[in-house]
From Swiss-Prot:
The active site is at C48 (nucleophile), H319 (proton acceptor). Deubiquitinating enzyme. Has almost no deubiquitinating activity by itself and requires the interaction with wdr48 to have a high activity. This is Ubiquitin carboxyl-terminal hydrolase 12. Keywords: Hydrolase, Metal-binding, Protease, Thiol protease, Ubl conjugation pathway, Zinc. InterPro entries: Papain-like_cys_pep_sf, Peptidase_C19, Peptidase_C19_UCH, USP_CS, USP_dom. The keyword Methyltransferase does not apply. The keyword Oxidoreductase does not apply. Residues 157-166 have a biased composition (Polar residues). Gene3D superfamilies: Cysteine proteinases. Belongs to the peptidase C19 family. USP12/USP46 subfamily. PANTHER family: UBIQUITIN CARBOXYL-TERMINAL HYDROLASE, UBIQUITIN CARBOXYL-TERMINAL HYDROLASE 12. Interacts with WDR48. It comes from Salmo salar. Residues 150-169 are annotated as: Disordered.
Length: 372
């Protein structure tokens, strides 16, 4: 049995090596970007949801640069952030240009820290992205808090560490990169008073419709909703419940806009989630038109830099891959396999025009990076 396992592993790595060699030849030594590395990630049992998100984040340059800068700081005790920093550092400092890396330490830590991922079942890539970004932000905030406490202890001002303890946690570079702000506007139809409430986000989840575009979906996200009957709005000016119009607008656009397409819908008659393989076009360039009147950067223009693609018919079955833009060309990362693809091939991941077949390769999470 051990001999068979060894032969199998050897054959697998030979295949990886051949794939890497082919990729290097296809890109060409003269065209290969300086200080760039393209490494597939080994699948440790249905960890494609993790691999695809990590590849997408690696090619979000502002995020990669912050992670690598964190790695150069004095070492701290192991956590999910240090494991991610070690993985990115390992990729960025390989002697070879292409190849395969096993993200074993990161996966082990992930499974240790969150029981949701502590199994060999397929998980949701969006849930993982959300967990990862929030965990990194929490760790950075905790480290900053510890550093300030240690500094106060060194200065002999222990009593001040609880000063302003009710203040919101400080912003981190995760927020600087991914955080945007929505404003929820409600207009009373009786007195015309408008009230608004801001809400921060690290990614936007949008409903999908058949044969549409991501621009259409984003406009739908901001459609005006009428609050009436039992859903009337309590107006502070009128001091009573009134009919009102409610809509969501984008007040602050993030540096990197992560868009989650809500492709999994719970079907009551089936008692389970099913996939909406609708064809939703996502352009290489994007500008949002559903910004608020007081938006800080309404004209911000975005370029598509990465897409996490779901292949299959449901959330707990199928496979995840990532397509990323690196310099002037596109790459497809399928766990340990890395291939160069044409920009036109991205159209294959829009979804299906027919609802008969639910099995498709569909864009699931889009990463747009601002030009400014």
């Amino acid at each position: 049995m051990e001999i068979l396992m060894t032969v199998s592993k050897f054959a697998s790595f030979c295949t990886m090596g051949a794939n890497a060699s082919a990729l290097e030849k296809e890109i060409g030594s003269e065209q290969f970007p300086v200080n760039e590395h393209y490494f597939g990630l080994v699948n440790f049992g249905n960890t494609c949801y993790c691999n695809s998100v990590l590849q997408a984040l690696y090619f979000c340059r502002p995020f990669r640069e912050k992670i690598l800068a964190y790695r150069s700081q004095p070492r701290r005790k192991e956590n999910l952030l240090t494991c991610l920093a070690d993985l990115f550092h390992s990729i960025a400092n390989q002697k070879r240009k292409v190849g395969v890396i096993p993200p074993k330490k990161f996966i082990t830590r992930l499974r240790k820290e969150n029981e949701l991922f502590d199994n060999y079942m397929q998980q949701d890539a969006h849930e993982f992205l959300n967990y990862l970004l929030n965990t990194i932000a929490d760790l950075l905030q905790e480290e900053r808090k510890q550093d300030k406490t240690n500094g106060r202890l060194a200065n002999g001002s222990l009593d001040s560490q609880n000063h302003n303890s009710n203040a919101p946690p400080p912003s981190t570079w995760v927020h600087e990169i991914f955080q945007g702000t929505l404003t929820n506007e409600t207009r009373c139809l009786t007195c015309e008073t408008i009230s608004s409430k801001d809400e921060d986000f690290l990614d936007l989840s949008v409903d999908v419709e058949q044969n549409t575009s991501i621009t259409h979906c984003l406009r739908g996200f901001s459609n005006t909703e009428t609050l009436c009957s039992e859903y009337k709005y309590y107006c502070e000016e009128c001091r009573s419940k009134q009919e009102a119009h409610k809509r969501m607008r984008v007040k602050k656009l993030p540096m990197i806009l992560a868009l989650h397409l809500k492709r999994f819908k719970y079907m009551e008659q089936l008692q389970r989630y099913t996939k909406l393989s609708y064809r939703v076009v996502f352009p290489l360039e994007l500008r949002l038109f559903n910004t608020s009147g007081d938006a800080t950067n309404p004209e911000r223009l975005y370029d598509l830099v990465a897409v996490v693609v779901h292949c299959g018919s449901g959330p707990n079955r199928g496979h995840y891959i990532a397509i990323v833009k690196s310099h002037d060309f596109w790459l497809l990362f399928d766990d340990d396999i890395v291939e160069k693809i044409d920009a036109q091939a991205i159209e294959e991941f829009y979804g299906l025009t027919s609802e008969i077949s639910k099995n498709s390769e569909s864009g699931y999470i889009l990463f747009y990076q601002s030009r400014d």
